[in-house]
Amino acid sequence: MKLLGLLSGLVVVATALPQADFDLQSSLLTDPTKVAGTTFDYIIAGGGLTGLTVAARLTENPNITVLVIERGFYESNIGPIIENLNHYGDIFGTSVDQAFETIPLAIHNRTEIVRSGKGLGGSTLVNGGSWTRPHKAQVDSWESVFGMEGWNWDSLLPYMKKIEAARAPNAEQIAAGHYYDPSCHGTDGIVHVGPRDTGESFSPMIKSLMKNANNSGIPVQKDLGCGVPHGISMILNDVHEDQTRSDAAREWLLPNYQRSNLKILTGQMVGKVLFDTTTTTPKAVGVNFGTHAKVNFDVHARHEVLLASGSAVSPQILEHSGVGLKAVLDNVGVEQLVDLPVGLNLQDQTTTTVRSNINSIGAGQGQAAYFATFNETFGDQAPRAHQLLNTKLEEWAKDVVSRGGFHNETALLVQYENYRDWLVNEDVSFAEIFIDTAGKLNLDLWDLIPFTRGYVHILDSDPYLRRFAYDPQFFLNELDVLGQAAASKLAREISNTGEMTQYFNGEAIPGNNLAYNATLDDWVDHVKQNFRANYHGVGTCSMMSKELGGVVDAAARVYGVESLRVIDGSIPPTQLSSHVMTVFYGMAQKVSEAILADYNATVN
């Protein structure tokens, strides 16, 4: 009966959406000459999560005109490959995946692929849909450490709740391992959030993992959206009750595309920002967009240009516009307009996998996350890890600057001391083990708090070639690789310990490739050759004080120019113990208010 009800809901959606989708498709602009030479109040470069959220918010005022320029197209209705979260990964390698390639990495001399959505909705089209929030101390540090007034947990939480249309789990889902604290969630928002449920029975393995953890004093079955993500619990997803993905285009564009003051241009990319340099401070007055060095156009902004192209692309747009480090710009022949550390401070995480075959008694659906503290991750090796934290920060900062991941050792040391405080004094979670029980016990895991820093920089003066170097410098910090190894070792241990032994039917990954009694150092050797990017890169246009290496201020305004902001995932100055969608949505709402405040001050 449960499965039948779910299927009937899916049929309703399948018959209800096509006309709206068709109307939206027909309303989108594909001819660049329709906007070339015209003027809008705001131009948004990128139609992803933050771009569409801010566009929807600004155009609530019918007097504000907005143009969104997106390289991709409307893809929300492409079918299960996007709409069904259980098809996660199937879309990779298609036209909806930007699939950025790193340079050959120093750790193993191979390139890695960084997945990122291309299309209206951005990475909300291709991600796993997980819905958690970071630790309070992490967001608080944006204000207390990095000088961003108004950026703390208490100020950001209302914005994160505002966008939610959250559903509490039902009794069966709670019995399987869900927990929901209504005080931490909003119910009147736009983004649908709730339990993922295929209609199948739930695996007993989640509760067995919880029982083992509880016996060790680790919290279980908690709401991971309340500011202290720690322990094991099933998690919410951005998904409708009928299990359709709640992506940004479906929620922020589909209801609003008919607004006469909102225009969406697809199939085009923003190459650079246009500046009026006749004033004392350069002022953004539009963008150059197109597809080719010989086929590009200008469009003008009456008030502001807003960059929302993501942590890999927004810094490239700035550099092509003359905003960045002189050495980088000189290398490609771009005249420097403003000196800022654009493209530095890149922080992404690394993922490895531990996978076990299971007996039939473990069968069933289920996804959960284990957010493990520093000491839980390292176990009896914690003293070794603490020794690194207590003795190596200055050396690490020097190494990062020498490799081009940051520009100032003293400023980077502030970041490192902040991270040490999180891990030692605040018990901020250091690793996440993501648990999936569908047909197996699959544990994907990552070190949440990397100390390494990388960069993204342009390699050509032509923005439409999109030639750039993306180097996250994975595992060039000894604590990063040790932490990844420790989390992997922990994942293997929890797969076949206590109550979990009854389900265990042999290990598939790493299996025979790594001895079962492998030491932590053996795991270090293993993870160096067996990892991928986690696709959570942040920091390349960091929001922090200029003295600490910031590119934008607390209102997301680019330092040293007027009428230009960066509003996407490149601005968080730190990594977070969370899946990042919730924070990006909250940021978009908060920055929208700053934009509107400046607009109202101008027109009034």
Swiss-Prot record:
Entry annotated with the keyword Secreted: yes
Catalytic activity line of the entry: beta-D-glucose + O2 = D-glucono-1,5-lactone + H2O2
Primary location recorded for the protein, binned into one broad class: secreted
Residue positions the entry lists as glycosylated: 63, 109, 214, 375, 408, 517, 600
Cross-referenced Pfam families: GMC_oxred_C, GMC_oxred_N
Localization terms from the record: Secreted; Secreted, Cell wall; Cytoplasm; Secreted, Extracellular space, Extracellular matrix
Family membership: Belongs to the GMC oxidoreductase family.
UniProt entry keywords in alphabetical sequence: Cell wall, Cytoplasm, Disulfide bond, Extracellular matrix, FAD, Flavoprotein, Glycoprotein, Oxidoreductase, Secreted, Signal, Virulence
EC number: 1.1.3.4
Transmembrane regions: none
Quaternary structure, from the entry: Homodimer.
Cross-referenced PROSITE patterns: GMC_OXRED_1 (PS00623), GMC_OXRED_2 (PS00624)
Tree of life domain: Eukaryota
Lineage: Eukaryota, Fungi, Dikarya, Ascomycota, Pezizomycotina
One GO BP annotation of this record: secondary metabolite biosynthetic process
Residue positions binding FAD: 49-50, 70, 123, 127-128, 130, 270, 569, 581
Gene Ontology CC terms: cytoplasm; extracellular region
Gene symbol of the encoding locus: gox1
Known function: Glucose oxidase catalyzes the oxidation of beta-D-glucose to D-glucono-delta-lactone and hydrogen peroxide in the presence of molecular oxygen. D-glucono-delta-lactone is sequentially hydrolyzed by lactonase to D-gluconic acid, and the resulting hydrogen peroxide is hydrolyzed by catalase to oxygen and water. Acts as a key factor contributing to fungal disease of apple. The production of gluconic acid leads to host tissue acidification that enhances the expression of pectolytic enzymes and the establishment of conditions for necrotrophic development of P.expansum.
Enzyme class of the recorded protein, top EC level: oxidoreductase
Active site per the UniProt annotation: 536
Gene Ontology terms, MF aspect: flavin adenine dinucleotide binding; oxidoreductase activity, acting on CH-OH group of donors
Name of the protein in question: Glucose oxidase 2
Annotated S-S bridges: 184-226
